[in-house]
Regions:
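N-terminal Rossmann NAD(P)H-binding glycine-rich loop of SDR-like oxidoreductase domains
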Residues: 6-24
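N-terminal Rossmann-fold cofactor-binding loop
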Residues: 31-36, 53
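Rossmann-fold cofactor-recognition segment
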Residues: 44-56
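NAD(P)H-binding glycine-rich loop region in Rossmannoid oxidoreductase-like domains
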Residues: 53-96, 127
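NAD(P)-cofactor binding segment of oxidoreductase domains
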Residues: 71, 86-116, 153
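Conserved Rossmann-fold NAD(P)-dependent oxidoreductase catalytic core, especially the SDR/UDP-sugar
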Residues: 101-147, 168
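Active-site Tyr-X1-5-Lys
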Residues: 143-168
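Conserved small/polar residues in nucleotide/adenosyl-binding loops
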Residues: 173-178
């Protein structure tokens, strides 16, 4: 059975991803803080791990222990992140630095997945053309205008420079369309 880790699994999107992974037959691991609500993670088949992203060395040791006990994950969906904060430095610490720490720790611990999916945001492109309202295209330059968007772009760019690491970047956005 293939194993998947979903970070940020306690949130709305993460909880949905965990349920979908179970439905598809994956051994599903939810990366959540010990203080996080697990209301969206009630299925008894979900396994939990509390990863310490902020300390790369500790995270590497934690993942190496995981690999010895359970083997590596086949897939990682990195959905953990910060969307609101009073201190803008937290965007960069959580969204960019913790992403880099996770990628480095996965590689260094022998836990590099077959595929790593970074859940990012259309905010990494900025507002787009507000005169013509032309939809944003992946060919457009990324010009984020918020610290949140800038931190997501920093994480994307870090990942793009890791040629040894198999990844996909998923851009999420909200729509008011019915």
């Amino acid at each position: 059975m293939k194993k998947i880790l979903i970070t940020g699994a306690s949130g709305f999107i993460g909880g949905f991803l965990a349920k979908e992974a179970l439905n598809r037959g994956y051994e599903t691991w939810a990366g959540v803080r010990s203080t996080s609500s697990r209301v969206n993670l009630q299925d008894e088949r979900i396994r939990f791990i509390d990863l310490k992203y902020s300390d790369r060395e500790s995270l590497t040791a934690q993942l190496a222990d995981f690999v010895r006990e359970h083997g590596p994950w086949d897939y990682v969906i990195h959905n953990a992140g910060l969307t609101k904060t009073l201190d803008k430095r937290n965007f960069y610490r959580i969204n960019a630095q913790n992403t880099a720490n996770l990628i480095e720790a996965l590689a260094a611990s022998g836990c590099k997945p077959e595929k790593f999916l970074l859940m990012s945001s259309l905010s990494s492109y900025g507002r787009g053309d507000e005169k013509t309202f032309r939809p944003i295209s992946l060919d457009d330059p990324q010009l984020p205008d918020t610290d949140y968007g800038k931190s997501k772009l920093e994480a994307e760019n870090y990942l793009r420079h890791q040629s040894y690491f198999p990844y996909v970047i998923c851009l999420l956005y909200t729509s008011d369309a019915a």
